[in-house]
Amino acid sequence: MAARAFARLSPLGTVVALFVGLVLPQALLGLPVAAAAVGPLPALAILAAVGLVMTVAAAAEAEALIRDGDFRRHGGYFGRLVERFLGRRAAVAPDALAGIRTGASVLASYIGLSVTLAALTGIPRIAWGALILVAVAVLLLRGGMRIPAAVGAMLGLAALPLLAAIAALAIAHGGGDISPATDFSATALGTVVGVTAMLYIANVYVVQIAAETLPQAPDGRALMRGSAIGTLAITAIAGAWLLATSAALRPEDLTGEVGTVLGPLADQTGAAVAVLGAALTVLLLGLGIERTAVAVMRLVAERLPAARHRWAALAPLAVCLLGELLLAADAVTFAGVFGVAGVATNLLLAVALPLMLLLAARRGGDVEPGPGARVPLAGRPAVAWTIVGAAALALALFATVLADGAFERVAAAIGLAALAVTVALARRAGSFAPVAARS
């Protein structure tokens, strides 16, 4: 049924719907919490700037996929795309960071689910934590739910009416404060940037969408433009959500919040938001923890002997148990996990890497895109390397002045080192060497 619903859309409409439904981020529920330290309007400006860069990056990755004949013939995944265009050695660091990002998403989902459902229902958090662990264990033992892309996208899109209803109730309630904070620090700004970066985790899903849509629209125009439009749609949804929640909440209402924005929002606005928020939490974070826990299990299984694959399910469960220990020690927050992960992993994976892939694909790809399927400007080396350099500069700033503590600075330094190593190894492999016949 879901596949038939998407089949009725134009190729462009299919890409946009799949993109928004699959990519709709869990970090959306942490953005208002992070933004409270700087104020909604400065956070909105950061969101607009990051969203613009991510739009270019998503389109760049889409064009790289369009140019990859091996992907069209045999399929593949994001790591194989990186290996194909940048070289096997250059793919090692991005592969490791992708695993870290996925593990961080499992951790954040566990924290968000257990803390938020406890706040919305009054049932103790430890009870929710135990229930989540059991549910995740059962799913992993069954190999996950094996949700097709169309069904997964429909489930993601089903969260939009819940978001809209909660936003409308928040605006109607009022009493919030959207003015900028007067005394925010550089570290608070850094957390907002990190959480905002984690709104854009499309790398894996663009590959999945390409596999679904390129056979029907092989010129690639729908994939490239739909990826850009989908990213803009995610940015617009995040901006509207931030303003709506800020209409009902003051920054002090979110100070020290461990879970998502939904708990404080329900406290301020009443039972209707509690009911809708519980449904949204289960749908958005529940779907997120299923996807990411299965992904972690498969990543670990790939690195174990075949006889020990069954032990791979322990890895995501261990991440959830780590979340429980950190919560008990009052040492972690939902927004904090995404803030660190966004800086340490996504500035490379979602910003720098797609631009590098585009440069390499224009040099070494074996399929020429159809009319309108080329990313304007960003494929020029000067523009692409400027964006890559901006990502490196941001990581350097996080490693020195924008990070909140030693752990965050080390995480940013690791991300910077991974970016430098990836660029160096890709250059050594000749991925960016000029070829006269390529534009």
PLM segments and residue spans:
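Helix-loop-helix junctions that connect adjacent transmembrane segments
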Residues: 3-6, 123-132, 146, 150-266
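Transmembrane alpha-helical segments of multi-pass small-molecule transport proteins
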Residues: 11-22, 94-99, 119-144, 158-166, ...
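Extracellular loop-to-transmembrane helix junctions
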Residues: 32-79, 230, 412-418
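Membrane-water interface regions at transmembrane-helix termini and the short interhelical loops
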Residues: 33, 37, 112-119, 133-155, ...
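Hydrophobic transmembrane alpha-helices that form the core helical bundles
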Residues: 56-127, 274-304, 351
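TM-loop-TM module centered on a large, flexible mid-protein loop between adjacent transmembrane helices
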Residues: 69-88, 231-286, 306, 328, ...
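A generic transmembrane alpha-helix motif of multi-pass inner-membrane proteins
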Residues: 333-363, 371-439
